Structures are given as C-alpha cells and as structure tokens.
C-alpha cells in the first residue's frame, strides 16, 4: 500500500508519502471508529487513542509538519479539523458511556512545532468526544532528544508542567506520562493541582506492585525505574543501526528489566514449586548480585549467610553515592541493602572468604558473587595514571584537565560526571565508536549528554604512552600529546579469580553457583538475573 500523510514528503526510510485527500480522511476516521467498536464488543471499558509522538494527530496538529494550504492546514482550527473528525467518529460509534482517552503531545520539542497552549486549545475543541487526556511529548524519529522515551538525563516527570498548562483549557481529567517513578512525585503533582492522575509506563515493568506498595505505605520497597532502556532499547525503524540483534530477536528482547529479574522470565515464577528442603547457603560478595541472590534464597525459605569483605554492602554500585547522574541506580542499591536488612539474613561484613575457611560456615552450598576489578593493561607509563573508578571513593583527587584513556561505558560515564563537576575532560578511545558495549537509545542519550557538556571525544585514537604530564596518542591526524593534570584509565574489567575458592568448596562436596560479574563482567541486569536464577536453585 502507498504511504499517505498530511503532506507530500519522503520519510526516513526513503518512502514517498502522498498527501491525504478527504476520501482518505473519511476512510481513516471510519477505521478508527470500527476499531473502537471491536474493543467495545470485546468487553473493554475504553480505548486510548495515541495522538502524540509524531503519529497521525501530531502530523496534522503541528504547524511544522502540516504545511497544507487548504482547509486542513494553516490555523489551529484547520489543523485540528481531521483529528476532531476521527474523535467524533469514534464517539458516535461507541456511544456516550465508553471511555475514549487521548494521548497528546504537550510539545514536540521541535522549533516551530507544537506548544502546550495550542494543545490546550485543541483539547478544549475535543472535549465533546473524549473523557480524559494523557500529556506526553516528542516525536518518534527523535525519541531520546525530544523526550518521547526519557532517559536518566531528563528530569523526572518531564511532562507535568505542560500538563498543568493544558489543564487550564479543559474541565476533563488531565494526566501526565514520562519519567514518573515515585509515588512522592505523583502525590506532589496532584496536590499542586498540576495533574489529576499520573501515568506509569516502564515503571510498571520495574515494579508491577508500585501502586499496592504505595497504598500500604511501603514506598521504600518500590524498585524505581532507571530509565536505562533495557526494556526497549530502540528499533531499526527509529534509525538505530547499532542494535546487536535482528528485528525478530528484538521482539524477544523487549520487556526485560535491569532491576526486576522477574520481568520476561521464560517461566512463570508464581508456578515455581517450593524448595524441597531448607539449606544453608553462603553467598560470597555483597554487591548487587550477592544481595539479590540473598533476597531470593531467603524468600524461598533458605538460611542465608552473606559475606562481604568490605565494611558496607553495595559492591561496585557504591559509586552511585557520588555520581549525580545515577540517583535512581543509587536508590536501587540502597533498596537492595534495605531488603537484605529487613530479612533474616546473616550478614557478615569485613569477612574475607578463603579456601581455608570456606567450609567453616556450615553451608550446603556457595554462591560466588565476587564481582570484577578494573583491568590494568601494559600501556607504557600506566603507572602515571589512575583507575577511573578510584576517583569515586576519594582515592584520587583529579585535577582540572583530565584525559580518560578508554571510552567504553565506564570511561564515558565517569568522564561525564567529571565534566559536569567542573573538570575539562578528553576521552580517548581506540575503537571507532564510544560506549561501544552500549547501543540504541541509551548510547544515544549518553553521547548526546557528553556533547552538550562540551566533552572532547577522540575515537579511533590509540594511546601510545602515558607521561607525568599527559598522554601521547596517535590517530588519522598523526601523533600528538594531550596535556593533562590527571590521567585516568577505564580499559575494561576482569572477573575476580574464584578458582581456588570454588575448588575448595567443591572438594568439600558443597554445591556452587557463579553469578554476576564473577561469570564475566557485565551490566546490572546480568547481575540481578543470574542472582535470581541461582537463588531459586538453593534447596531444590
């Protein structure tokens, strides 16, 4: 079928779009109405019509997208004519008592595009046909930069203020969606009269019990969405050509969650048989993986000893106590600590597990959650540099001008933190792409934030030598020396060697599991998922 739209154009995929005529509009309005009646006959209470994100309604309402010169373009009344035709057809088809909700952009964040004032005026026109309004923002082709799917670098509740403007134009209930992950923000926005209700999307994957926990006063037990895009990283349709899977594989990937290991499991956790017996399990390592494994095993009736060699739980996630871009990840780390503390888990801090004492805890099995450490490759002059992670806990006091050797996720995120706190950072990366182990929307959000902050980025650049005053590098422009007050390196991570511990445990007949970075260095989602799967195995 040919593509049609408000105007003649060529879309991102190179497909020519024909401008719609009135016959097209009548057919599409009728299709909307028929679809709504199908939902009504199927027993649903209502439908939500998505009019935002650069879809059909936005294409007509936006003065930037709709440049028609007939009665469907120009003034707001003209641009609203076809969207109102659709809503009117739907309402007439389903009758007065069926819910018809409308999701609409408060702004598309495009110069010359939609404004909250115009959206408010449109909502006033649509009042006879709809029952409530969802305020969102942005366009599909620029999901990250326009806030359609907000990142951790966007403010929470980024559409609430625009919803408050739109609310002035209508008596209908107005809600906001986007970046809302706390009951406190919901309550505040409603109490201030900015919205009538809050809408949660990704947050309900992070914690489906959000509303129930808030109702019971257990806000501190809510797993709050990180906006990390694990659940949906983007798609080829949106122009992401760096996704490490096909469209078919993407369909299987969607719905996973970094902080909720139960999301998208290949089985229903509610159907798990109870543990056949109670066992004692020793968990070595108190990072994210170790804590999640302890929580899961304890909840299944097992006796848990959680041994952490340091004075605090948290592992590598303790860097979030400092990094101002990671408040939600810090909240998750703190939640895991609280969840461990409120359970009957025997926590042993400042406890080093050795091959000699691993059998002295009376455990039936051992879960190794020993994590990873920064790699220190043989770069000439590496002794003049410091590990990037060391600056988070005060081991390093960086100077003003910093060169970060290694532009993977750790190097980029640590460099971004330093840039935002007043330092001048240059990131040097051998590969042609920074943050190469990331992809899709998160990588776009990270690189965009780095660009906005003025970080210098040198991909396809080899580090030849680190000196007391800088870094000697080589790229297509030749050899040069980058001056630096401090040189940091983030050149990968390596798993802590657990071979002697594992051998000692297995020699004594103990069951063993390896989870998280102890398997191989990875991300938080790999830690929580492997931890949950190990935790449910204890006692089986």
Positions of the model-derived regions?
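Rossmann-like dinucleotide-binding cores of NAD(P)H-dependent redox enzymes
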Residues: 303-343, 417-461, 519
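Glycine-centered short loops/turns at secondary-structure junctions
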Residues: 43, 171, 193, 301-303, ...
